[in-house]
């Protein structure tokens, strides 16, 4: 992709409004250092020096979309608690529309606490309640979806198996979005495989793709287009989900784009250094759907999302990528 084409696509990012539907959560990082072992048990003592919070899950997809320049609305469920207030405030500070964040007093806001010491993540604590939505909350979610749908150019479904998306609710939302001819994308969860149908794009990672295809995981080979098991998985998911585009992310091997009736297309990674892969999948789907909504063809959109992923894995924590960083990444890799 030449520089002019990239700039044309990026210039259209700010004209898009994207609706993100899924499980929102708050990421908490406790940063510190280890200087001794506890006398109570053979474990390190971490002296906490600072604390930071970031939107996580579907909220991180919204954060990524805002960093790329688009308008964003997020539809999700919070608890009536401090983490929920913190998450809402963080999103509002970043310009994300939070009118679709529905409070359910019978569940806590999902909170993931990571302890990072001496530059290494040591442990993660999850505080959450993974149950289906009560009927009245599900009705509110669908009402908001129908209200917002007419104003957006694309819809992203983000399932983290926390309970927002039931198969019934997803089916209704998919049908409405497809009828309205919106760009649609989904990031599946291997612990609770929902049935997607006819979306513009689906973006599993390698292990998620194998799980969805019902095949035992097989370690990758270096030549992606000679990875017969991966190619079989891709074709299986094209038949199962019937997406127009299936983008399987492959970590250090990049990505592989599958489309009905076309040969698989491998996109090598452009990451220079990898410090933290948390949230990279959120960046991929955010960039992919935004590029497609902005008029990029599937290969162009996949290449742009590959560069965005290369940027964020070089940062610590759930990070984002800006249009300027995308331009710089493409420039580096043209040399």
How should each PLM-predicted stretch be described?
Residues 13, 149-150, 193-197:
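A short, aliphatic-rich alpha-helical micro-motif
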Residues 148-164:
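Short acidic, glycine-rich surface-loop motifs adjacent to enzyme active sites
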Residues 236, 240, 244-245, 270-333:
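Conserved post-catalytic alpha-helical subdomain immediately downstream of the catalytic base
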Residues 1-35, 330:
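Positively charged, low-complexity intrinsically disordered leader regions
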Residues 101-107, 114-149:
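Conserved phosphate-binding/catalytic loop of the ribokinase/pfkB sugar-kinase fold
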Residues 2-7, 39, 43-111, 329:
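Substrate-binding N-lobe of the ribokinase-like
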Residues 19-21, 124, 153-156, 185, ...:
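Structural motif
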Residues 163-264:
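Conserved phosphate/ATP/ADP-binding segment of small-molecule kinases
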């Amino acid at each position: 992709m030449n520089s002019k084409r990239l700039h044309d696509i990026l210039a259209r990012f700010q004209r898009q409004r994207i609706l993100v539907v899924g499980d929102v959560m708050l990421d908490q990082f406790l940063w510190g250092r280890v200087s001794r072992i506890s006398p109570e048990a053979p474990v390190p003592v971490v002296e906490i020096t600072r604390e930071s919070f970031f939107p996580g899950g579907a909220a991180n997809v919204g954060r990524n979309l805002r960093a790329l320049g688009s308008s964003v609305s997020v539809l999700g469920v919070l608890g009536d608690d401090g983490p929920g207030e913190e998450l809402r405030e963080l999103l509002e500070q970043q310009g994300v529309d939070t009118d679709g964040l529905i409070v359910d007093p019978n569940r806590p806001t999902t909170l993931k606490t990571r302890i990072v010491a001496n530059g290494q993540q040591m442990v993660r604590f999850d505080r959450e309640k993974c149950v289906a939505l009560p009927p009245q909350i599900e009705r509110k979610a669908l009402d908001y979806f129908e209200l917002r749908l007419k104003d957006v150019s694309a819809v992203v479904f983000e399932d983290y198996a926390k309970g927002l998306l039931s198969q019934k609710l997803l089916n209704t939302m998919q049908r409405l979005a497809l009828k309205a001819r919106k760009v649609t994308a989904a990031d599946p969860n291997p612990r609770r495989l929902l049935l997607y149908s006819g979306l513009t794009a689906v973006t599993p990672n390698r292990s998620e793709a194998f799980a969805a295809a019902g095949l035992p995981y097989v370690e990758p080979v270096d030549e992606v287009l000679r990875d017969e098991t991966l190619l079989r998985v891709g074709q299986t998911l094209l038949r199962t989900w019937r997406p127009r585009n299936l983008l399987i992310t492959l970590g250090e091997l990049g990505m592989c784009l599958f489309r009905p009736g076309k040969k698989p297309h491998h996109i090598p990674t452009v990451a220079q250094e990898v410090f933290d892969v948390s949230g990279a999948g959120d960046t991929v789907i955010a960039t992919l759907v935004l590029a497609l909504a902005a008029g990029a063809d599937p290969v162009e959109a996949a290449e742009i999302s590959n560069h965005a992923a290369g940027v964020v894995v070089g940062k610590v924590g759930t990070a984002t990528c800006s249009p300027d960083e995308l331009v710089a990444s493409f420039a580096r890799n043209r040399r």
